[in-house]
Design a protein with these regions (language model features):
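Glycine- and small/polar-enriched repetitive beta-structure motifs of secreted/surface proteins
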Residues: 1-182
């Protein structure tokens, strides 16, 4: 909080944590946690460089090394090593897992749980549970992928349900499919 002149209700613990904060009610714990936050408010960033590059994020929780690193949005929860790392415009997402939604710049109301779940997602209203579930999805919406690598290759597919290990793994554009089992 070295540069703070008007903000109130902030907590910063760690070298350069919350350094640029001008709004209030932020908690930054860890080296460079919430380092660039200027106008964001009511955020929690815990971990080395957690929510480091975001400038105007609001109501986010980032726990883990560089979790929610680029976020300027609101209502996101990212827990894990580089979880939601490139998330810059998505909102109301829940991301739990090492590099879950790592390369996803957008996407709203997405749930990703598991190592690299929803890795490239930029779409809305998807649920990916399991390691690499919905890994390649960029614009497909309304998908449910539960299981290791389920809907893995899906890029633009919509409204699919895949439950099981590698269920509908190689589908890239097909829509409205249901697969139960490996």
């Amino acid at each position: 909080l070295r540069s703070v002149t008007t903000a109130c209700g902030n907590i910063a613990i760690g070298y350069m944590a919350g350094q640029a904060t001008t709004n209030g009610d932020n908690t930054a714990i860890g080296f460079c946690a919430m380092h660039s936050n200027t106008s964001g408010e009511a955020n929690v960033a815990i971990g080395l460089c957690a929510s480091r590059a975001g400038t105007g994020a609001r109501h986010n929780v980032a726990i883990g090394f560089r979790a929610l690193d680029s976020s300027n949005t609101c209502g996101n929860v990212a827990i894990g090593y580089q979880a939601a790392y490139n998330q810059s415009s998505g909102k109301c997402n829940v991301v739990i897992g090492c590099q879950a939604m790592y390369n996803a710049a957008g996407g709203c109301e997405f749930v990703a749980v598991g190592h690299k779940a929803g890795y490239s997602n930029n779409a809305d209203f998807n649920t990916a549970i399991g390691s690499c579930a919905l890994y390649s999805n960029t614009t497909g919406t309304g998908n449910l992928a539960v299981g290791h690598c389920s809907l893995y290759a899906s890029v633009t597919s919509n409204n699919n349900v895949a439950v099981g290990d590698e269920a509908i793994r190689n589908n890239t554009t097909g829509a409205s499919n249901v697969a139960l089992g490996a």
